[in-house]
Amino acid sequence: NVEDAAGESVSVAAATKDPNASFLENQRRLRNERAQAEADEKKAAELASQHIGMDISVAANEEQASSNTVSSAVELNTPINPKEPFTRYKYPTLNLLKKYEDNGAYIDEEEQIANKNRIIEVLGNFGVQIKTIRATVGPTITLYEIQPAEGVRISKIKNLEDDIALSLAALGIRIIAPIPGKGTIGIEVPNAKANIVSMESILNSKKFQETKMELPIALGKTITNEVFMVDLAKIPHLLVAGATGQGKSVGLNAIITSLLYKKHPNELKLVLIDPKKVEFSVYSRIANHFMAAVSDEEEPIITDVTKVVRTLNSLCVLMDSRYDLLKKAGARNIKEYNQKYINHRLKLTDGHEYMPYVVVIIDEFGDLIMTAGKEVELPIARIAQLARAVGIHMIIATQRPTTTIITGNIKANFPGRIAFKVTSAIDSKTILDRTGANQLIGRGDMLYLNGNEPVRVQCAFVDTPEIERINEYISSQPGPIEPLELPEPANEGEAMGGGNVDTRNLDPYFEDCLLYTSPSPRDRG
């Protein structure tokens, strides 16, 4: 264009004569470009919902290990092998678990696009404009990640939770506003077709097989299809709650199965408390290998309330004796102590021995509290407060997460929480200190909390025939001929910190004070 060329030559000539001319020309050009960009952005924000594209992605499945046998958590190549004399013990193999063919996330594009359009429509009806929307498909839940337009309040979207659920005609919708670490808002929507998260796919993942956790618990998969694991040794105690039939028992079985696939009988002992008498009975076959019990107990699975109290008091005695050994050894925790033991740095004549981890699992904790009350609550609280360093960890489960069952004393000492679907928002607040568990869809859908924000996880599924095969395999392996014997429990007064009073060392004014403070006969009558 002749005119453009002429204008350009004039501009260059002017810049040659005046040094400021080029600077002023550049400033005008930048202002024009900025104004045009703002106009384009404003126009894009006003587009109708059908013009907003959406990326649909499925996170890749965890890489599977090639071996059929799960390796132990940490191989102890040391002078003393803590696995002796049962070094020929073989860990359970993965072919004992059922392998489901349909193990990947299923994408129904029509469903995703329909949900996207409904979400945009509902938000638009309330004056909420969005810039982008992205969907990540998980096993049972799809996460729609939304980037709202400038000036949109997060609380406004959060308040539309019920309207979005009504529009999508779905239960279990949850809004995360904002998603931690991102400048986006998440809307979790259940898939029309859910996929089973098998225990086999979890234990066969590289993440589980190569973990260095002391007590690895594989719970399931997240919305992003990632294997979700926690270390019970670091939690250090876990509170599990959920209404009947929502996956609580399956979750406990997944926890036990994870530990059985990773730990040697010399490294782990279980104390299983089952007031219902049916939940843990399948594990009685591995009592000699993996159980711990008071000496005169006939049944490896504890079901009687009086025996539960004795066992808990026995665990308190065990905890105190272990602390004495740690003090003698100059160790701060069980890991340091065991490392000194296997490196020949402790004298066996001083009573030192290898310490296995002890995991106490209590099902139907509510029944125990209703029948035994403080007799159960006090030793549990004491163990939860002090036992972490000596390798004693607790998992308690209940289907009634009320404040009378889960007291403030219990909650304060159980930082790890798992909530399956509960019946009310009040129950959700009791277990998680927030709502959300009442909005889950059931069938293993759960929230895990051990910090600020809960993580939504689809619990791994392991059924009774699989557990029976695992227990049969373990029982055929070389191992101890009887359960680990727990120390004799202290009598009731000593367990509660009381005991008989030695009157010889009392203050000389004690009897006078006692008479002064005691009620008069008239008051007693």
Language model features by range: what are they?
Residues 1-237:
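Low-complexity, intrinsically disordered P/S/T-rich segments
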Residues 86-92, 179-184, 188, 206-332, ...:
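P-loop NTPase catalytic phosphate-binding loop
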Residues 105-116, 137, 150, 154, ...:
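Conserved phosphate/pyrophosphate-binding and hydrolysis machinery centered on Walker-type P-loop NTPases
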Residues 115, 157-160, 255, 311, ...:
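Hydrophobic side chains in well-ordered alpha-helices
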Residues 146, 341, 408-412:
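Short glycine/threonine-rich loop-to-helix capping motif typified by GTGT followed
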Residues 315, 340-342:
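Conserved helicase/translocase P-loop NTPase motor core
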Residues 328-337, 487:
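Short catalytic/ligand-gating loop segments at beta-alpha or beta-beta junctions
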Residues 450-518, 522:
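Conserved alpha/beta core segments of nucleic-acid transaction machinery
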